């Protein structure tokens, strides 16, 4: 299953060991994490606007995006969240996020949502189709 990641999820992913991925994969199949190009742009902006510790985390997230995940081009939108939602709907993929507002909007669109709880990957919402 393809899973498109937002900035919040990616930042936590690089800073915290995450468990339960194998259980999610047993349910959905192999997870292919996708990073939208707009998230990379957002990370690059963050890298220059934060302190040294957070800047190193952002740099690690950018490097990991290119080495371990697939970076995908998404339709440009005024807001990164809109681009992620549009991509998820068009390509029928799940979304990994920590962002409450984005999760709410994804639920309204009946999309599969993966999030973190106590350093474990969980299914926050499942498509009803």
Language-model regions, residue ranges each:
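Nuclease catalytic cores that cleave nucleic-acid phosphodiester bonds
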Residues: 39-129
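Domain-level signal for Mg2+-assisted phosphodiester chemistry and nucleotide/NA-binding surfaces
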Residues: 1-68
